[in-house]
Amino acid sequence: MQIILLQRIVNLGKLGETVDVKPGYGRNFLIPLGKALPATKANIEKFEARRAELEAEEAKEVAVAQERADALADVNVIMRAKSGDEGKLFGSIGTRDIAEALTNSGLEVDRAEIKLPEGTLRQIGEYNVDIQLHHDVTATILVTILSEDGDNEDLDENDATDENEE
């Protein structure tokens, strides 16, 4: 089944491309969600008439995502968790915890936007975490995990100033 993409879809194509997909994927997913149109002559003409509008919407989304990325550029999230003697956490810190900490600091981030390629964080330390705000826009934040016991002497001086960013 040939379809016209109305937005960029990972591993498939970008806005305006005509691609072949399995009929079920096109009929049951892409077309009902408004991500594509069947590639008929009438739909191709409709798309070409709306092409500039769709490209402007895409550019606007990228600009908004870039603004959010700029706001997240220098963010350092400090989280405290119970840990053992070797710095291993009792439990873990995942995307939900990081999203909650960012939301509490006034930055709206959905947990689906946070990417932890190696899984949840299970050790005390500093981690660079990517936040995928748009297909083309990714921000990186620093997540610092400290022990609730207060055994981190080197970071205790900075806690008073960075505590508000949590």
From Swiss-Prot:
GO terms of biological process kind: translation
Entry-linked SUPFAM superfamilies: L9 N-domain-like (SSF55658), Ribosomal protein L9 C-domain (SSF55653)
GO terms for MF: rRNA binding; structural constituent of ribosome
Pfam families referenced in this protein's UniProt entry, alphabetically: Ribosomal_L9_C, Ribosomal_L9_N
Lineage: superkingdom: Bacteria
Keywords recorded for this protein, A-Z: Ribonucleoprotein, Ribosomal protein, RNA-binding, rRNA-binding
InterPro entries, per database record: Ribosomal_bL9 (IPR000244), Ribosomal_bL9/RNase_H1_N (IPR009027), Ribosomal_bL9_bac/chp (IPR020594), Ribosomal_bL9_C (IPR020069), Ribosomal_bL9_C_sf (IPR036791), Ribosomal_bL9_N (IPR020070), Ribosomal_bL9_N_sf (IPR036935)
A GO cellular-component term linked to this record: ribosome
HAMAP family: Ribosomal_bL9
Listed NCBIfam families: L9 (TIGR00158)
Function: Binds to the 23S rRNA.
PANTHER family: 50S RIBOSOMAL PROTEIN L9
Similarity remark: Belongs to the bacterial ribosomal protein bL9 family.
UniProt name for this protein: Large ribosomal subunit protein bL9
Organism: Psychrobacter arcticus (strain DSM 17307 / VKM B-2377 / 273-4)
Upper taxonomic lineage: Bacteria, Pseudomonadati, Pseudomonadota, Gammaproteobacteria, Moraxellales
Gene that specifies this protein: rplI
